[in-house]
Amino acid sequence: MRWERFFDDLEDQLAAEWEAERAALESEAERLRVARLDLRSRLAGLAGEAEGPVALELLDGFVRDVRISAVGADWIAAPEAADARRMLLVPIGAIRGIQVGHGDLLRSARPAETRDRLAERVTFALALRDLSRRRVGVAVGVAAAGEAGAARTLTGTIDRVGADHLDLAMHDAGAPRRAADVRGYRMLPLAGVAWVRVDAGAGAPVV
């Protein structure tokens, strides 16, 4: 028996077994990583990286084509694909589905760089409080109560934001908030808000 050949074969066998074990461990680690992914992480993977527009199916029943530019703690900032001057603030809880290309689908699941930016900890309510503080005119998309599939768009200025709701002074879009021009007031639960739109130059939150 040629011992050199024996030891060579043994080394090859051990190397193959180690490689198989390493691949199995990596595969299991990847499965565990993917199992821990949440929707916010997938959206963060698309922010500024998507090959094309992303179609968001939202709480109000509409589909919005957008380009995700930033992701907060529980919301995204996304200019409309057709008009980048119109910025949508969308709570992640209002998203019912996301249509993406296959490349973007895979990209969103890749391991993300470790970041701890302050913007990523800004909540939806905090972003709305910033709009309220600056008296920025907005459009708010909400589902209509008691009408399945129906939705409304309300325009006005956010007067204040509570823990789970906002107060909207309703007036014409593009007009300043003047008492004489306010048509009425609405308290809107944040859970029922599908999106808030701010036009360019109106002072959208910086994220």
Regions from the language model: what does each represent?
Residues 1-64, 70-207:
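Short glycine-rich, low-complexity segments
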